[in-house]
Amino acid sequence: MDIKQQRAIDRYVGVPLCWLLSGVNRIISNEPDGVPPKKILVILLSEMGSLVLAHPMFVRLKQQYPEASIHVLMFAKNREVLDLMNVIPPENIITLDDSGFKSLVKDSLKAIFTMRKLKIDAAIDCELFARISSIFSYLSGATFRVGFHRHTQEGLYRGTFINRAVTYNPYRHLTQQFLSLAAALESDTTPANKLLPEPYTGKTPVLEFPVEELLQTTRDLHNFFPPIKEKKLVLIYPSGGILPIRAWPLKYYCQLAKTLLDEGYAVGVIGLKGDRAVAQQVVDFCKDPACVNLAGYTKSVRHLLAV
């Protein structure tokens, strides 16, 4: 499904479900009993980048609850990133196929059954605006339900069943926001955890590759694109993906690529297969054999990182 379809489903299906579940929660409320959670579910569906930024939160949860098992609910297309981070056991990852409406519904029902079977104690909804994630947090059966809430601010209606509601603060880095969600499990204020969380001082994870894998990746790249062989390679991503507003205007990428080439670097324009046309515009502007179109060249996130 594309982003417009996802938003439509989230609005026209999500709002009634949030309203219905809020009513159910008022009648049948399962409040936390104060016992530290033994099984924690983290819901991080849509953003590949958010998974990386959530690393400190995963570390903090393991520190706060060393006896607890941590599970993750996410879209299947983003799983590779979480596997590369190596913070969650593979068997604790629950995935949803969002390529179509039928597959999403089918996997959602499976996920709800799995979460109920696991007897989740706490659900941490890391999505900023989506309603589907808050619905999953309630249907997981968790008594602790942590998530962002608009409170008195403007924002999307996500129901009233989040019992550890955290105010989203656009002036804080997203890593701090995620740490606030972890801290909210033990918060007794309303909104939950209004203070800055304790700073994360741990090390940034580094992905290590076998030497032979890196050498083979380099050989393959140079065989495909001989002009870049003797140069340092800089990768740029001009597309913006499903949210083009994130990207600079294309002319800025063209100017950046030209400047890098003039300084002696090779430039690789990356992206998915669908981004090849945009990448080619940068290549055509530069008119330099050391500027190459790598959109669709890499086979996986790991392959891209190895490049």
PLM features per residue range, with description:
Residues M1-V307:
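Catalytic machinery of carbohydrate-active enzymes
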